[in-house]
Amino acid sequence: MISFTNLSRYTDIGSNCYLLDMDGVRIVLDSGMHPKKDGAEATPEFNLIGAADPDTIFITHSHLDHIGTLPVLQDKYPAAEVNMTAATCEVGLAMLHNSVNVMTAKRTQEGIIDYPFYTHMELDHVARCWMPRPYG
């Protein structure tokens, strides 16, 4: 049996995240952060993943609406394998570190207490688990 679940909180572009279940193999596709929302409202609805943990996470590319909450997802499901291209690993890490800076500034300037979702140290820790895959 195959099921496809949209974990995105909204129907517009942003917080892209999907669960593909194929005969019990559970794959999360992307883990984005919505660019026009703040705090928890910017995240996918990870609670829809359900009781069974995902087996793997696949990131399509390094735009924040596809990778922005990956460290949050990894924290919830540390055993899930994380796959992406080598270029996505490199650019994604830089994008996510910049995101920490932006979230930290928003917490200070706008009082958004949910931010930051993760720290630079936490990001570096989870990034060690990323598995770069050849493109093509």
Where are these regions (language model features)?
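Extreme N-terminal starter segment of soluble prokaryotic enzymes
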Residues: M1-F4, R26
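A short catalytic or substrate-binding loop motif that flags glycine-/basic-rich loops and adjacent residues
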Residues: Y10-G14
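Short acidic-hydrophobic, aromatic-tinged amphipathic segments that line or gate anion-handling sites
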Residues: A127-Y135
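Hydrophobic residues at beta-strand termini and immediately following loops
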Residues: L7, L29, R133
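Generic structural signal for residues in well-ordered beta-strands
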Residues: F4, V82, C129-W130
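N-terminal amphipathic, basic-rich helices that act as targeting or association modules
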Residues: F4-T5, H61
